[in-house]
């Protein structure tokens, strides 16, 4: 019985953004937006939103317990986990997006994914993969509401801080490239 050589397996198609990472400027800007708070806190104020710490790092959905609200974190922990979360957002964007992005678009999607998570960003990813950048921009701009529990009922409210952030994240998808033929006129 002869051993047959193994059939070569087709290489997985490379994603068009496989070598991209968040720019230094965008990462620094996001670090300013995600202000470091060196303790656990509720991201929408007293008894509202989700239990969060550091640079907008989700501890868990729902408000912090009184024990958690007393928990302090140090700058090193914030920096380490922020870096891990940014790297995770970059991997998600690289894996999820099948069309070419420019650096500003990649940066914006990393920021969106860091903040909204892969599930929150998934509709935007679908629109971008259909090359519907205008639709993606509109979708990002609508992502300004968060769930809170009020009088025992879950309700959505506008998070004022997200309005500016979503405008910045959607901007690279609103900008339409000028066709080369238009430049030569």
Question: Which role does the model predict for each range below?
Answer:
Residues 30, 105-113, 139-140:
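Short alpha-helical scaffolding segments that buttress acidic/His motifs in well-ordered protein cores
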Residues 43-68:
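Substrate-binding/active-site groove segments that recognize
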Residues 53-54, 110-114, 126-127:
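Amphipathic alpha-helical segments that form the core helices of the histone-fold
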Residues 98-105:
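Structural motif
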Residues 1-42, 48, 57, 73-86, ...:
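Long, amphipathic alpha-helical surface segments
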């Amino acid at each position: 019985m002869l051993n047959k050589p193994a059939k070569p397996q087709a290489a997985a198609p490379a994603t068009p953004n496989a070598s991209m990472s968040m720019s230094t400027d965008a990462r620094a800007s996001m670090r300013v937006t995600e202000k470091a708070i060196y303790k656990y806190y509720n991201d929408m104020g007293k008894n509202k939103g989700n239990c969060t710490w550091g640079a907008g790092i989700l501890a868990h959905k729902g408000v912090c317990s009184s024990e958690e609200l007393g928990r302090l974190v140090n700058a090193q922990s914030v920096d380490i986990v922020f870096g891990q979360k940014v790297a995770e957002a970059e991997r998600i964007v690289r894996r999820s997006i099948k069309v070419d992005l420019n650096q500003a678009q990649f940066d914006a999607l990393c920021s969106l994914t860091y903040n909204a998570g892969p599930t929150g960003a998934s509709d935007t990813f679908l629109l971008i993969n259909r090359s519907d950048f205008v639709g993606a921009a509109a979708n990002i701009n609508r992502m300004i509401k968060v769930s809170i529990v009020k009088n025992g009922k879950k309700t959505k409210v506008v998070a004022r801080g997200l309005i500016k952030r979503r405008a910045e994240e959607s901007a690279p998808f609103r900008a339409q490239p000028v066709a080369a033929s238009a430049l030569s006129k």
